[in-house]
């Protein structure tokens, strides 16, 4: 891929605050982070580890053997955390850092709301363009915003249907945690350079204005436009951050790259040469090539209310059906992923990339105990596999630092991470002694399962051989080494916790489910490549001796090693159902008894909780193939976990729920995690008629499905790798060989599936 981030930065007018008198635009660049090795003299930064941790493992495990779980918990909380020096006294991470904003632009228009009418704000999912339009004194005004990924530029266009009506003043409000300098760049632009106080990270942006009619001048810190017919603003932005897959731990500048004042200049020169029309054509072609792959319709015979989205959502919350709102939410999730995760940049964080604070919620970091993983659940199934690349590169950047964490805490081979990560390879726990959330060593293997997922959907053997397999293998090595081989011959994860829930335990179900998943992935990957037969046997041996799933006193899947589950517990995390989703070791088809135990858990946990939690439960009910209950969760997500602009809310805004919702809808209509393609596995009664085209199944199949009166009408399966295809619809099955590039139509003929 070359040098990451040199050619493109994904920022958005993502937090636009529209008004007649002024437009306020928050600038977000995902590599603008506080923290990192520059704050800790290089090598010290990577040793945010309690170096005696692995030495205490034997004592902790002996305490479990002795039945003294209290002692085991105490020893764990005293030794399996990070160092307090990495956080300031107010508990705001210092060396860990936080995603921060570049500041805000203001475009003052001189207009008031007097005699204003027909004000509309539009986000077109078809073109990824934001539009503001209104009438003022009989004149139609319009403002357009888009970002061209191929050209690394943000574009804003101000027009009116009468000449000479653009009187604008563009100004900037800086990030107050940086030393900054803003000056005119010629007579038509501004150039800003900044340095974060915390770590010395450099950042810059440039603005150029192009006008028709009237006058334009740049002076000091403003661009002033008078009596113009039309104004186009171009903005380029960058930081000096450089992703590093093999950082030199002695170098405090391991993540420092090119001068952003120069990279933004090159971007701007390119944009100016092309002009507005070409920039828009490039943007539209690039975006639609991804977004238009999938089409989705629910009950198309029912019309769409002609109301603003927030009013439609309000009506939906009152129980008024709106199937087009449901399909809009689905496609909005795909739009958000395209906008926040493109090759050559960081992955989507807790808020995707949209935030307007110097210290956002949870530092707007990468939470590895479900949140970043949930962000990528819809990527491959909704035909956006390219959008997985930022996650893949992020995982690659964690490996070398993660090897230190694996060694320090478990004396293990391979690599792992902890609950929170930043863009500088931070893989250790934070300093908190609250082990319920701070101890989670299997999040590294959970991340690594996405590597196999990407391969399984794309069947890109070159990727698996050159990049993917080593990530999976080294993660599997950690998974094995961190386990406790007990005197009775079983393997268990001790110490471990069920993320954000409950005590330190000698083997929580979640940890075992993740280990089971990564070992199965490693076994399959080694077979595909015909390598590591000896190590594969070890993985297979550990799987046979890993503590199995267990069912508790009220029929529930156990969360911990003992039956302490509370049937009244409605906690938001449903960690012990990892094997149901996103894993694939529990299914009503292959393991019906375990699936029933998972159902009991979900029934007791309830149908509420945070937005992202409802998104997860939606996927789990879909995996249980209960379409009506999955639909209930989807409705709850929209009614109780969605803001007026369709962002997910925790509260506060957290983007993972959007992605979980989109993924869950796909799971309702198509599943392929059990070794076959299952059509309409969880179709709800409410969606009597509909169609979806362009979604993907494992094995590199692209699938389109239509249904009528709740029954399959037909499916089109496009085989992109030419492997055998195994299809299931209800209790009907069909197997057939395929040819690469050929499409196959599947229909019902009598009581059987047939291929045409």
PLM regions and their residue ranges:
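A generic, residue-level signal for flexible/boundary positions that often mark functional hotspots
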Residues: 217, 348, 457, 673, ...
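Aromatic-residue-lined binding/catalytic grooves and analogous aromatic/hydrophobic interfacial grooves
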Residues: 1-435, 453, 473, 486, ...
